[in-house]
Design a protein with these regions (language model features):
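Secondary-structure capping and boundary motifs in well-ordered enzyme cores
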Residues: 112, 147, 151, 181, ...
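Dynamic "connector" segments at or just before major functional cores
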Residues: 1-184, 189-194, 217-230, 243, ...
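Active-site beta-loop-alpha junctions of metal-dependent nucleic acid enzymes
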Residues: 230-251
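Extended, well-ordered alpha-helical scaffold/bundle regions in very large, multi-domain proteins
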Residues: 138-162, 398, 402-472
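Acidic, metal-coordinating catalytic cores used for nucleic-acid/nucleotide bond scission
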Residues: 257-266, 284-287, 416
Length: 494
């Protein structure tokens, strides 16, 4: 296709030799150079990277390659181009339109600082006060909120002050907890320095005895939205932490879905005495399921079977004790085959501390089995599906959960740590806005939330100082397709 003269006239000349190509109805600019071809005895054209695109309305719009060149070359003699990370920030704001209003309602004087640091935390992985200002100045947030103080000392003071506002933080979170909802809990251990008063010796799921605090997180089952959290000492027993956190949410008639390791007779009694409904996963070596049940290879031992994702899941339900509790046991044959395959492969390659033979897999009679204790007398499929949603949450939570420890290591006081915990919570709210949008548009099968964040981080807002205002850098076709499906318009404010 011939390139229109109006497009050719907008070809940038400051980069040296460049040519315009028509691809898919759009006009892209590529760097070109010549290289001597000794075989042909003449110069040969070599096409380099694309540096942007040209439109009739906006002229040349640089992409990431073009922006780097512009910064290196200082295109204008007096004013360097102003480049801001834009795409991911604007996308997250558009996907969470109500969050601004909620923050403004409960934190009218500081909601912009909370929003800004939380977004920097999510998009750029910021985990300490000293890294906030550099990321802020490079981001679109510095244009939105250019008057807020983001120096290291200012950020430290702000976070510590935020940590003293726990009552207001709780009210903000309680507004998200609906009566009669099903709540899922996730407890993560946070390692701190030994001098921090919040930290105390206590076992975490990895059996370390380092100084630690625990953040007990509460998620709403159906939306997967994080709605509440509580910071507790590592030495406080889970029973006390659970009951205190449930009371703090203000939720009535809730169903508690806990993480593995919480089950014990004492904890069950505490939940029953508090009048709470619960679903508690049991350890693989639980005594609540008879050994002979695992050894019995006859599928007639099961009550029935249902399908999940086109694979069979067998179940057995039986009463436990005299207080209305039930044990629900399931076997996922797909998971069983997967675990057996891993065991055999490890044995063949000699992995592991103990020497094992592939045929030893026959001794692993509990593979693919998992059980729960609950005081709900319901169809076993409901128990399975409820906890399956919790597994999904665990996978998603890992994105921020893995970096919480880094944030905590910079906490010099209890108030500072609590302030970071709340900023992390707001980051999670933005993250789940993206996650739920991917689910609703059926894009989650192709792209994770992390994938989309990485793609949109490469979209910039550029002001070359030509008096025509900022422009959005070129957007890859794949990325634009994702944004269109999510209903995101990155040009709406430009």
């Amino acid at each position: 296709m011939a390139i229109p003269e109006s497009i050719k006239n907008k070809r940038p000349t400051q980069f040296g030799a460049a040519e315009v190509r028509s691809i898919g109805g759009h006009y892209y600019v590529y760097l070109v150079r010549s290289k001597w071809d000794a075989v042909k005895g003449r110069p040969q054209k070599v096409t380099g990277k694309s540096i942007g695109k040209i439109t009739e309305a906006d002229g040349f719009i640089p992409n990431a390659n073009g922006l780097r060149l512009m910064q290196e070359m200082r295109i204008t003699p007096d004013v360097a181009p102003k480049v801001r990370n834009y795409g991911a920030y604007e996308m997250l704001c558009q996907l969470n339109p109500d969050l601004d209003g909620q923050l403004k309602e409960f934190f009218p004087d500081t909601f912009r600082e909370i929003r800004t640091i939380s977004l920097l935390r999510l998009v750029d992985g910021i985990s300490s006060a000293k890294m906030v200002q550099p990321a802020f100045l490079d981001s679109y947030m510095s244009d939105l909120c250019g008057d807020i103080a983001m120096s290291e000392s200012s950020v430290r003071r702000f976070i510590a002050k935020l940590g003293t506002m726990q009552d207001r933080i709780d009210e903000f979170m309680k507004a998200d907890v609906m009566p009669g909802t099903t709540l899922m809990f996730d407890g993560t251990s946070i390692f701190l320095r030994s001098e921090d008063s919040l930290s105390a010796k206590g076992y975490n799921p990895h059996h370390n005895q380092n100084p630690q605090a625990r953040i007990l997180y509460v998620f709403e089952k159906d939306s997967h939205r994080p709605v509440f959290y509580r910071v507790v000492q590592g030495s406080i027993v889970d029973k006390a932490a659970f009951l205190e956190t449930v009371r703090a949410t203000g939720c009535e008639d809730c169903i508690i879905i806990a993480d593995k390791g919480f089950y014990s007779k004492r904890n069950v009694s505490a939940l029953l005495n508090a009048g709470l409904k619960f679903i508690l996963p049991l350890q693989d070596n639980t005594v609540n399921v008879p050994e002979e049940f695992y050894r019995d290879q006859d599928d007639g031992k099961w009550d029935d079977v249902f399908t999940y994702n086109k694979r069979p899941v067998w179940y057995w339900k039986h009463p436990s004790g005299n207080k209305g509790n039930f044990i629900y046991t399931f076997r996922d044959d797909f998971r069983k085959a997967e675990l057996e395959g891993h065991f055999i492969e490890s044995a063949e390659k000699g992995y592991g501390e103990e020497e094992q033979k592939p045929a030893d897999v026959r001794k692993e009679i509990r593979m693919g089995y998992f059980s729960f204790c609950s005081n709900l007398d319901v169809d076993p499929r409901e128990i399975y599906l409820s906890y399956k949603q919790r597994w999904d949450i665990e996978q998603c939570f890992d994105y921020l959960k893995n970096s919480v420890s880094t944030s905590a290591s910079h906490a010099h006081t209890d108030e500072y740590f609590r302030g970071w915990a709340f900023l992390n919570h707001v980051s999670l709210l933005y993250y789940y806005g993206l996650l739920n949008a991917l689910r609703q548009t059926k894009l989650d099968g192709k792209y994770s939330a992390e994938d989309v964040l990485k793609l949109t981080k490469n979209i910039y807002q550029v002001d070359t100082g030509d008096g025509q205002g900022p422009k959005v850098s070129a957007i890859q076709k794949k990325t634009q397709g994702i944004l269109d499906q999510l209903g995101i318009d990155l040009l709406r404010k430009i």
